[in-house]
Amino acid sequence: CPAERLAEIKKGHDLIVAEAENIKKTAMEVAEKLKDKIPVIYASGSYEALAIRVRQQFNENDKKLSWAGALPEMNHNELVGWGGGDNRFGVVFLNTKDLIERNQKRLEITLNSIGMKTDTVINLEAKGNSKIEKTLYLNSVLDWASLYIANLNNVDCIEVEIIDYLKDSLAKI
């Protein structure tokens, strides 16, 4: 129902406003941990779109390759790839605290396994009661984190020369 969704969005907005200072503080803590890392963003399947959005923010704002995956799907092949993982990678799990018990255990085992390969594993807990509130909260934290990382790395988050090059090249076809 649209009215219910609007009410949830309003609650999400109110949460972000109320938590603004905490969001920025948490974002800076995340940024400091990921500053020199390749960000890897994981979420439960129902929050995969958020993980992708966060990956894109790291791509665009810090001009940094990143990737995103979702539990339990990443446990099929990607977890094997962590056999070659190392400290170049920094993992952020978007923890919405609403996993079923089996998937919560899966998360703990997965993060422990990945933690054997990299020293940076961040279990970022959402605030909020609804999926919309949790999504808006985590999105805000990590949007700020991507901007803070760009600043820490002296990267111009506005610059998009490679996109301009692509557009100019395509215009000549």
Feature roles, as predicted:
Residues C1-I173:
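A SIS-like phosphosugar-recognition module
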